[in-house]
A protein has these predicted regions:
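GST-like domain detector, emphasizing the conserved glutathione-binding G-site
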Residues: 1-8, 14-84
Length: 84
């Protein structure tokens, strides 16, 4: 299962959401506070508070605070077969 931790106004999170929608990737959206000091669940899961954060529990992968790395990872593992 893929989970994306983000907040709506974050432009980096938006880039990831748009790419996941474009590639029709199923995921659970987890909204977090804009205030890093209130991102307790995210800190517990990833050890950090940066967004966007992608959690891929099926592959035991967590990528935090780097939209380019997240998109590259999704491209490698989840993009549609027709684009490969």
């Amino acid at each position: 299962m893929l989970e994306l931790y983000q907040f709506e106004e974050c432009p980096y999170s938006r880039q990831v959401r748009l790419k996941m929608s474009e590639w029709e990737i199923d995921y659970v959206l987890r909204n977090v506070s804009k205030l890093k000091s209130k991102r307790h669940r995210l800190k517990k899961i990833s050890g950090q508070t940066g967004v966007p954060t992608l959690v891929d529990s099926g592959r035991n992968v967590i990528i935090t605070g780097d939209e380019k790395r997240i998109i590259t990872y999704l491209h490698k593992h989840y993009r549609p077969q027709a684009e490969q």
